[in-house]
């Protein structure tokens, strides 16, 4: 892969840079093996170019991509001066020793591993055998690769000085005096290395690999969770990768042309912004002019003065100051309002204006629901006749009481009721039109929202509720005493419990909204409820709940075709991965729906499937966190990582200063 080739060349130049300056100055150069084993690097291809040849710093390396684009890459400070703070003394550990931690393996069943023709059997503290099996029976001779002889002594001064076991973080045993070797006539011997593997607590101890570096001399690697409590054998915390920043290096004329394009683009952007602002001002001034209330021709000047004074009362203080004048002219205003009702004041119009900012489809759906709820209450509100003052209603009621006829109805309001009926009919017609428009808009919106968009909206709502729950938890922690939720574990348990409850509530909401989706969801559900205990339990039930398929792509052949290798179902590492996924699903209350694909890109190793480890120790340790991020935290982080990878690919394919202008590489090539 192109990115890996670029990173490998960078590291090669880095190591040469560590050696060459020392030789030129007469010093002694050395290659830090600890740096190679424990330091990680990550390359970042940036879109911002620089003028080539201007930097003469020792931490800048010039490389070229496969598209012949030159880059100036700045190495991190840790690559030049590797300083790691670590305690050379043994950490304070009061638990059992390494032999005591491994002693339960003596009573456990022997471990088996089949590789090609041979099957290897390891019995802790006793022997290692090699034989061929057919139909679960041993065929032919049984060869002993060695009998137990000794175990590594961590307290020995010579062992402390070597630091081999401490750096590699493994415990070893020596097995010797095995069967006679036909090639050299010496007895066979073997070294057994025990490594901590926290995932082995689910799948059990297993033989990871069997190597034969020298004829009839073997190395067995066994992974177990029994050694993980010991600080010397526990894997170190994975540090963040050291970033190697690479900028495209341009020639002086190319760089000046780039600066010219940037200046022109900035000017165009500023001009566009000014035009938009001018347009907004014109629209705003036009809306103000259109919104001005028209003058009435049949209103006297004294009435206009009173109304203008009344409409000028915008703040609460001005309303209180002018309340006496309003009461003084109350009767005149009431008579005039009965003859010619005044329009609603602009102050009320401004107070009734509501601004809705729609940032996502979820906000749009909520706005539609609010409009529906508001439409239901409109007819009853509109039927009430608005008055100019609160005392108007009692006055009209008193007048109506005096003027009641024999039938108990005000005779003077008969004609007004006819007019009200006509207004109500017009309002009902308007409501029906609004409801019809709203229904059509909602249907179009439902047609636009695909099922994937609905799921995304639900995930956004869930993420927002989780953030609110996080805020509630933080406020609770502040209010409680110091002994409340101090422990991080209690806090995590509370968050997980709330998240699980939230997931159940969302499922119930889905069931109430769409019964058809519920039936489809039940059909697609992969994790069934626990069946009643049967007299003959089968071991195939967990495979129906969660199935993990691990494949490997390796270029091979004259045409560099990709060879697809699939991990065997009997591989202990596959069972370990399935156990991790099942554990995350059960703890979070989630269901195994659909398919999740995770790509791990790293330099490939030569050899057959059995000779290479599918996942590194770091991949296995981080796999649980990867599943948690994808299943629990939603697709936000995944989208960010996908966008970052896309930007890296685009920046890598970009070729500056090509004859036809800027160009890009072949989009069909598999780079990352």
From Swiss-Prot:
Domain MRH span(s) in chain numbering: 108-230
Bias kind Basic and acidic residues: ranges: 263-281, 294-310, 320-338, 372-386, 394-409, 637-652
GO CC, alphabetical: endoplasmic reticulum lumen; Hrd1p ubiquitin ligase complex
Disordered, as annotated region: 261-355, 372-452, 511-548, 637-672
Keyword terms: Disulfide bond, Endoplasmic reticulum, Glycoprotein, Lectin, Signal
Major location (coarse): endoplasmic reticulum
Protein known as: Protein OS-9
Residues bearing carbohydrate: 177
Cited function: Lectin component of the HRD1 complex, which functions in endoplasmic reticulum (ER) quality control and ER-associated degradation (ERAD). Specifically recognizes and binds improperly folded glycoproteins as well as hyperglycosylated proteins, retain them in the ER, and transfers them to the ubiquitination machinery and promote their degradation. Possible targets include TRPV4 as well as hyperglycosylated HSP90B1.
PROSITE patterns in the cross-refs: MRH (PS51914)
Disulfide bonds: 110-123, 181-216, 196-228
Record family assignment: Belongs to the OS-9 family.
Organism of provenance: Mus musculus (Mouse)
Acidic residues bias spans: 414-435, 663-672
Keyword Endoplasmic reticulum assigned: yes
Signal peptide (residue range): 1-26
SUPFAM superfamilies from the UniProt entry: Mannose 6-phosphate receptor domain
BP-aspect Gene Ontology terms: endoplasmic reticulum unfolded protein response; ERAD pathway; negative regulation of retrograde protein transport, ER to cytosol; protein retention in ER lumen; protein targeting; protein ubiquitination; response to endoplasmic reticulum stress; ubiquitin-dependent protein catabolic process
Subcellular localization, as worded in the UniProt entry: Endoplasmic reticulum lumen
Binding site for a mannooligosaccharide derivative: 117-118, 130, 182, 188, 212, 218
GO molecular function, one term: glycosylation-dependent protein binding
Protein modification: N-glycosylated. Intramolecular disulfide bonds.
Assembly: Component of the HRD1 complex, which comprises at least SYNV1/HRD1, DERL1/2, FAM8A1, HERPUD1/HERP, OS9, SEL1L and UBE2J1. FAM8A1 is stabilized by interaction with SYNV1, which prevents its proteasomal degradation. OS9 and UBE2J1 recruitment to the complex may be mediated by SEL1L. Through this complex, may interact with ERLEC1 and HSPA5. Interacts (via C-terminus) with CPNE6 (via second C2 domain); this interaction occurs in a calcium-dependent manner in vitro. Interacts with CREB3.
């Amino acid at each position: 892969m192109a990115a890996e080739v670029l990173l490998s060349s960078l590291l090669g130049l880095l190591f040469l840079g560590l050696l060459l300056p020392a030789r030129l100055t007469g010093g002694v150069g050395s290659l830090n093996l600890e740096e190679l084993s424990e330091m990680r690097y990550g390359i970042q291809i940036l879109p911002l170019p620089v003028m080539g040849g201007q930097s003469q710093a020792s931490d800048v390396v010039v490389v070229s991509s496969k598209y012949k684009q030159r880059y100036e890459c700045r190495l991190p400070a840790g690559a030049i001066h590797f300083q790691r703070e670590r305690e050379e003394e043994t950490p304070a550990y009061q638990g059992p020793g390494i032999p005591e931690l491994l002693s339960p393996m003596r009573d456990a069943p022997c471990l088996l591993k089949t590789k090609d023709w041979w099957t290897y059997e390891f019995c802790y503290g006793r022997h290692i055998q090699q034989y061929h099996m057919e139909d679960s029976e041993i065929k032919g001779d049984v060869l002993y690769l060695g009998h137990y002889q000794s175990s590594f002594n961590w307290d020995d001064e010579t062992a402390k000085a070597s630091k081999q076991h401490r750096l590699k973080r493994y415990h070893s045993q020596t097995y010797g005096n095995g069967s006679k070797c036909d090639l050299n006539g010496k007895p066979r011997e073997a070294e057994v290395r025990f490594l901590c593997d926290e995932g082995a607590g689910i799948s059990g101890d297993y033989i990871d690999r069997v190597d034969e570096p020298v004829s009839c001399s073997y190395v067995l690697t066994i992974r177990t969770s029994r050694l993980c409590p010991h600080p010397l054998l526990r894997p170190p915390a994975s540090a963040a990768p050291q970033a190697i920043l690479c900028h495209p290096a341009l020639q002086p004329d190319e760089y000046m042309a780039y600066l010219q394009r940037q200046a022109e683009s900035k000017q165009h952007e500023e001009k566009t912004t000014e035009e938009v602002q001018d347009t907004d001002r014109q629209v705003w001034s036009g809306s103000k002019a259109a919104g001005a209330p028209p003058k009435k021709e049949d209103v006297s000047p004294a009435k206009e003065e009173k109304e203008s004074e009344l409409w000028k009362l915008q703040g609460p203080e001005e309303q209180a100051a002018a309340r006496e004048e309003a009461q003084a002219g109350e009767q005149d205003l009431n008579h005039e309002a009965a003859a010619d009702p005044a329009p609603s004041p602009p102050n009320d119009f401004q107070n009734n204006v509501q601004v809705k900012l729609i940032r996502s489809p979820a906000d749009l759906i909520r706005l539609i629901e609010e409009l529906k709820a508001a439409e239901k209450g409109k007819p009853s509100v509109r039927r009430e006749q608005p008055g100019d003052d609160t005392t108007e209603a009692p006055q009209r009621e008193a007048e109506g009481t005096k003027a009641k006829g024999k039938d108990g109805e005000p005779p003077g309001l008969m004609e007004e009721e006819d007019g009200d009926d006509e207004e109500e009919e017009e309002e009902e017609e308007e409501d029906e039109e609004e409801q019809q428009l709203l229904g059509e808009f909602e249907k179009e919106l439902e047609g636009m929202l695909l099922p994937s968009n609905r799921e995304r909206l639900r995930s956004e709502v869930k993420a927002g509720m989780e953030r609110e729950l996080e805020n509630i938890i933080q406020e609770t922690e502040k209010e409680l005493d110091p002994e409340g939720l101090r422990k991080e574990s209690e806090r995590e348990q509370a968050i997980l419990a709330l998240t699980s409850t939230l997931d159940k509530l969302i499922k119930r909401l889905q069931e109430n909204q769409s019964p058809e989706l519920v039936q489809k969801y039940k059909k697609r559900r992969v994790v069934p409820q626990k069946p009643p205990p049967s007299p003959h339990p089968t071991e195939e039930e967990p495979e129906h709940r969660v199935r993990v398929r691990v494949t490997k792509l390796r270029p091979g052949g004259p045409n560099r075709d990709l060879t697809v290798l699939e991990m065997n179902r009997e591989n202990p590492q596959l069972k370990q991965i399935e156990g991790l996924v099942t554990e995350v699903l059960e703890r979070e209350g989630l269901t195994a729906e659909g398919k999740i694909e995770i790509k791990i890109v790293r330099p490939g190793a030569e050899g057959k499937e059995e000779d290479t480890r599918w996942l590194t120790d770091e991949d296995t340790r981080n796999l649980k966190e990867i599943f948690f991020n994808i299943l629990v935290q939603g697709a936000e982080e995944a989208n960010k990582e996908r966008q970052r990878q896309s930007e890296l690919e685009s920046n890598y394919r970009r070729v500056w200063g090509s004859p036809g202008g800027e160009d890009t590489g072949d989009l069909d090539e598999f780079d990352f």
